[in-house]
């Protein structure tokens, strides 16, 4: 396990160097840990930026129209925006791998196990605490069973460090709650149902990184297998599209992506402020 953690630390460092999310605007506060010097981190802590924001991205196939690093690209933009809006936080490097399984049919996914993610989250959280952060926030760009991992790690570490006045929280509203509410808004406007690599993922990637991560010429044919509602089962006689898309992404746009992105930031900052006892 220790060797695995060391290997992933090296991978994360490599990913950080290649990050396109840099603070180029001189007037914008430095909030990305990987783009700061140790002296700048120390000063930020002294100035009250004592909340560390950890966000997990992921390397996963996202249909023929989206690049495999979409979770990570969106994660970098999201966690930076949250840090800027909070004003008392630092965005830590985004983890580019999360629990998943590779496939030769749809090659694009490189995944961890839940056990390894647990170990990594515990390690980086405690490293942030050693660095001087008083609050650690865990967030992820995934649904499924992964939120349980974040919640369990946060609960365990919070119980361990609370006697020292240090807290660890899991912020879940940034992903499913924000997306579910936005999905209802779109459906009310006549947009088709969508899920993985559908209108939400594609639109948000168009807003965050545009041509760098979305093949816009393929959006017009970006339709996959249908989204199943609660209790629905797939028709065994219906042909499978199996192109990595669930739903319909053909009406994707950067404008829709911005609306979803802004909702994520709104939901996350509201929940984190509640954790920290700040005014909403």
Give the residues covered by each predicted segment.
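Positively charged n-region of N-terminal signal peptides that target proteins for export
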Residues: 1-4
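Extended, histidine- and acidic-residue-enriched regions that form the cofactor-binding/catalytic faces
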Residues: 21-101, 105-115, 119-137, 141-280
